[in-house]
């Protein structure tokens, strides 16, 4: 279920992915939607730099632990062409 491009994510990045994937799959019942939402959650904390995932400088500004809903937008980055962008509410 983890997209190929995310296999070298740090441990905490993978935890974020799986947490959001599981939550989104239960809520929406779609694996495709769950992957898109989970990738967006990861992108709030990590960015891909020369093939390596790095913590974003503003990573602490994004809360990926909250269970409350807020409208956020995931934007596409140049370095993740095989990971689709998504618009979502988490």
Curated annotation (Swiss-Prot):
Annotated Low complexity bias: 63-74
Pfam families xref list: ChaB
Segments for region (Disordered): 53-90
InterPro entries, sorted: ChaB, ChaB_sf
Domain of life from the UniProt record: Viruses
Protein's name according to its UniProt entry: Uncharacterized 10.2 kDa protein
Organism: Orgyia pseudotsugata multicapsid polyhedrosis virus (OpMNPV)
């Amino acid at each position: 279920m983890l997209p190929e491009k995310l296999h070298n994510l740090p441990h905490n990045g993978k935890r974020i992915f799986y947490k959001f994937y599981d939550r989104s799959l239960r809520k929406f019942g779609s694996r495709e939607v769950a992957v898109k939402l989970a990738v967006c959650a990861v992108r709030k904390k990590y960015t891909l730099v020369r093939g390596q995932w790095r913590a974003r400088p503003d990573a602490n500004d994004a809360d990926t632990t909250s269970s409350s809903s807020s409208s956020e937008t995931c934007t596409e980055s140049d370095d993740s062409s095989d990971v689709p962008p998504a618009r979502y509410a988490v």
